[in-house]
Amino acid sequence: MAYTVNQIITEGIPVRHLEQLEFFEKAGEHGCMTLKGSVEAEEGEALLYGLPQNSPITVRTEDQILFSGIITKLTVTGTENTGMVEVTAHTRSILMDQKKRSRSFQNTAMTYRELAGKILKEYPDSDIFLAIPDVPLGSIAIQYEETDWQFLRRMFSLLKAPLTSLSSSESIRLYAGVPTLQW
């Protein structure tokens, strides 16, 4: 669906005029959004020095979220009156890719959904949808010096199920497998 610039609302960065907006999705990767636009000069300075780590950003229309994620890169340039911002953001699944862990899951009867549930309980309001049969692991699962994202991606790859993140969710929503589409 196509939208006009006037229909796009940004939350998290006070963009006055949107110049460029792109979304990128790829199986096995975090969803990504890049945006370029102008802000008031004083807002640009405040963004440059006052934006905390893992700051959220949402791009929406009046009735639909187009992208919701975490700002991973911010560049501010400008003059006395106007600032330009360039933002790169990733889906909230990027929060799962920040800390390496080592642990084991020794219940071989545990299913892949249960394994994902144990990992995701550390991330508030997170969830996973499986587009594959939920089967037992069948062996011990070891996460060694991997982030939670790397570990789940590897585990689901054993079932040939790509792991993706829903980019229009304000929390971590994962999808394992290939969705079935209704024509």
Regions found by a protein language model. Give the residues of each.
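Second-shell loop/turn segments in exported
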Residues: 100-109, 138-142
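Edge/loop elements at the starts and ends of beta-strands within beta-rich repeat scaffolds
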Residues: 26, 81-82, 125-126, 169-170
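Short secondary-structure capping/junction motifs at helix and strand boundaries
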Residues: 68-69, 125-128, 162-164
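Glycine-rich, acidic and aromatic/proline-enriched surface loops and short helix-turn segments
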Residues: 92, 109-129
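Short beta-strand-centered interaction patches in the first periplasmic/extracellular domains
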Residues: 73-75, 84-85, 91-93, 132-183
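Long, intrinsically disordered, low-complexity accessory segments associated with secretion
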Residues: 99-102, 112, 116-117, 148-151, ...
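Assembly/oligomerization scaffold segments
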Residues: 1-102, 158
